[in-house]
From Swiss-Prot:
Residues 61-80 bind DNA. GO terms for cellular component: PCNA complex. GO terms for molecular function: DNA binding; DNA polymerase processivity factor activity. The lineage of its organism: Eukaryota, Fungi, Dikarya, Ascomycota, Pezizomycotina. NCBIfam families: pcna (TIGR00590). It comes from the Eukaryota. It comes from Chaetomium thermophilum (strain DSM 1495 / CBS 144.50 / IMI 039719) (Thermochaetoides thermophila). Homotrimer. Keywords: DNA damage, DNA repair, DNA replication, DNA-binding, Isopeptide bond, Nucleus, Ubl conjugation. Belongs to the PCNA family. This is Proliferating cell nuclear antigen. Gene3D superfamilies: DNA Polymerase III, subunit A, domain 2. Its main location: nucleus. There is a cross-link at K164 (Glycyl lysine isopeptide (Lys-Gly) (interchain with G-Cter in SUMO)).
């Protein structure tokens, strides 16, 4: 039996909004430590990994491991019925056919209840190796969103280059080229607006802007974003969901010919 109560439905709504254009069907894997999701996009270029830790729910109960196979378009339709401030409870039996969602209004006595039919989804689990990244950039999530959106008007690809001087996002397109350079700076009054760059060695990689713009839909979940780079390994873009819960996106770099 699974029973998981979220104080704010908005968290799940925003997570699903952020990933539904990348992934159509996926398993929510529930166990006693929380609810996890891992899925590749159709072209196998990007990977989504989410963890909602048990301590983010109150209460949280999961007696045995359950995989909830969900179509994200269908889940979006059900979640539209929830107000952001609603209390959301997820329930499922041990061998479930449906996921039960209950939305309770915190202001009125309204309770909405929906059953979402589940699917059998065969999903391979990819072991994501722990990587020591050459560069880790922590920056305001809306700034990262703006940079990717601005550069996408010029080109399909962006080169992200981190060195001791800062981090540079640059692109070249048919109409010209453009770049944005950020240097480390600390904003004491508004720490969320600080830019931190940790660097063990210089790194320069090229990525598809279409995917990065897509990842930035998760900006609604967190004020800051962490971008981790190493030569020849996928980029990691991580948004915190509070506590040790997270939403992570991995993106393979473009190599030589496909730039």
């Amino acid at each position: 039996m699974l029973e998981a109560r979220l104080e704010q439905a908005s968290i799940l709504k925003k997570v699903v909004d952020a990933i539904k254009d990348l992934v159509q069907d996926c398993n929510f894997d529930c166990n006693d430590s929380g609810i996890a999701l891992q899925a590749m996009d159709n072209s196998h270029v990007a990977l989504v990994s989410m963890m909602l830790k048990a301590e983010g729910f109150s209460p949280y109960r999961c007696d045995r491991n359950i995989a909830l196979g969900v179509n994200l378009t269908s889940l979006t339709k059900v979640l539209r019925a929830a107000q952001n401030e609603d209390i959301l409870t997820l329930k499922a039996e041990d061998a479930p056919d449906v996921l039960n969602l209950v939305f309770e209004s915190s202001e009125t006595d309204r309770i909405s209840e929906y059953d979402l039919k589940l699917m059998d989804i065969d999903q391979e689990h990819l072991g994501i190796p722990e990587t020591e990244y050459a560069a880790t950039i922590t920056m305001p999530s809306n700034e990262f969103k703006r940079i990717t959106t601005d550069l996408m008007a010029m080109s399909e690809s962006v080169t992200i280059e981190a060195n001791k001087d800062g981090v540079k996002f640059s692109c070249q397109g048919d109409i010209g080229n453009g770049s944005v350079t950020l240097r480390q700076h600390t904003n004491v009054e508004k720490p969320n607006e600080s830019i931190e760059i940790e660097l063990s060695e210089p790194v320069s990689l090229t990525f598809s802007l279409k995917y990065l713009v897509n990842f930035c839909k998760a900006s609604a979940l967190s004020n800051t974003v962490k971008i981790c780079l190493s030569n020849e390994v996928p980029l990691l873009v991580e948004y915190s969901l509070g506590g040790s819960s997270y939403l992570r996106f991995y993106l393979a770099p473009k190599i030589g010919d496909d730039e």
